[in-house]
Structure formats: structure tokens, C-alpha cells
Amino acid sequence: AWACKLKKIPCLSIGHQAAVLNAAVPQPAHTDALGRAVLAHYAPSKHALSFHYLPYHKNIYTAIIRQELRLMPVTNAGHVTVYLPAFGDKQIIRLLELFPEVDWQVFSKHSKESYRVGNVFIQPINSKSFLTSMASASAVLCGAGFQTTAEALFLKKKLMVVPMRGQIEQQCNAAALAALGVQVLKSLKPKRREEVAAWIKHDQHIDLYFPDNAAEVVRTILTHPLLKEASNEATPVVAYKPFRKKLITRIFNPAGKKGRS
């Protein structure tokens, strides 16, 4: 993006970050001005095609849900799937063990081996195991990152998020999630016990629609006026076909497996 800006070449921004800064998207009551400035200038572009929980704007699509998850059976085995990479295992366990009646399945980036502390089962991060756990969970407790929260909502799981402090994107996601009815927890301190207890006790009904929109997004990108204009000017034409191939491969075959469409 910066290379394009410096060379005065039009750039199309694709991703979630552009949606976070869109005025049509719910915003937190108090924002970090410096964080917003960094996010706005990290990959500057006047043209954007982005993703969020709802199509808040004509240039915002709902999240692209990977086919692997779309094809998974959705059940309720009674456990709660937990993914909080910003917190250490001890900090997570200290809060979760206050609820011995709950089966907590924690995926940790800090642990290389699985172990159990009472009703809290800690295991290393593994994409397949995590998706299986989430698809069969009664609820999901996670950070306010976009992908995991969108996937939990797609699976129609009860959701609670703990946004990372100082991370403007997660703070904005949390504001959007709160507007949808998702419980937002400010920290994992034991004083938050009653909030967690209330979340465990009560049901949550958030019915969002995430259409299988990957092909539509690809078509929109490839027919975008900016790309047509660029093709006429011949500046980025050399990169057009490789870009298209990589984009389609990334969306329809994210794991790089042969034979998947």
C-alpha cells in the first residue's frame, strides 16, 4: 500500500481493517487516537473492499467462512471452547476454575503439551482440533479478533469476548459485537466472576447470516473499476493474472491441499 502511495498508483485495500475505520461501523465510546492513526496509516488506500459481521456499507461484505467449517456438523457437547492468546494459562485457569460445573476446553499458544487442572483442560493450538471443539461447543470464550468471533457467530454459538487492551481493531470489533448482543468482558480478573456467571447461566440468540460469498467477492475484485482503470493504464497489468490466481487459491484452498475446490 505504501509503495503504491509513494508511486501514486491506485491501490485496492482488501480485508477487515478497512471496515474497522468505516464510519458506518459501530465504534467504541472511547477510542485510542494514536491507535486509530496507526491503523489508518498502516496500509493507506482510498479504495477498499472489506469484511465485517454485517454489511454495514456497500463496500463491506460479511465474513468469508472457510469451507472446512461450513461442512462441519454443528452439535452441543456441553463444553465451552476458549481461545485467549493474549493471556497466560495461569491467568485463564484462575478465573475458569471458579466455575467447576463448566467443562472448559482451552487452546493455548503458551503450552506445547496438554494438561488438566480440575475442570479446565489446556491443549496446544491445533486448527483442526480447535474447529472441532468450537463446532461441538455450547459456547465460545475468546478474544475479539475477527475470524474466530465471526466463525463462532456463524456456528450460532453463545459468545463472550475479551478484547486485547491497546489493540484498536479488537476494541472496535468488541463495540460491534456488543451492539449485536455479545457479552464483552473487560478483563480476566476474578472480580469479573459475576459477569461470567451471568453469561454461563443465560442463553444468547444472535441470528446472523453468513452467505457463501467467496466467489462473489472474487468477481467483485476482478471487475472492480480500479483494476479496469489500471489495466488500461498498463501499470500493474503484469501482476494481474498472478494476483487473480493467488487470490482464488487462497480463498478456495486456504490449507494448500490438493483436490479441494
Enumerate the predicted regions with their spans:
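A donor-sugar binding/catalytic signature common to diverse glycosyltransferases
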Residues: A1, S13, S133-C172
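N-terminal glycine-rich phosphate/adenylate-binding segment common to multiple enzyme folds
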Residues: A1-A18
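Short loop/helix-cap segments at secondary-structure boundaries that form the rim of catalytic
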Residues: W2-L6, Y42, H52-I60, M72-T75, ...
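A nucleotide-sugar donor-handling region in carbohydrate enzymes
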Residues: G15, A19-D89, F107-H110
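Nucleotide-sugar donor-binding patch of glycosyltransferase catalytic domains
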Residues: A29-H30, K158-D203
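Donor-nucleotide binding loops and adjacent catalytic segments primarily
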Residues: I64-A139, K189
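C-terminal amphipathic helix plus adjacent low-complexity
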Residues: E194-S261
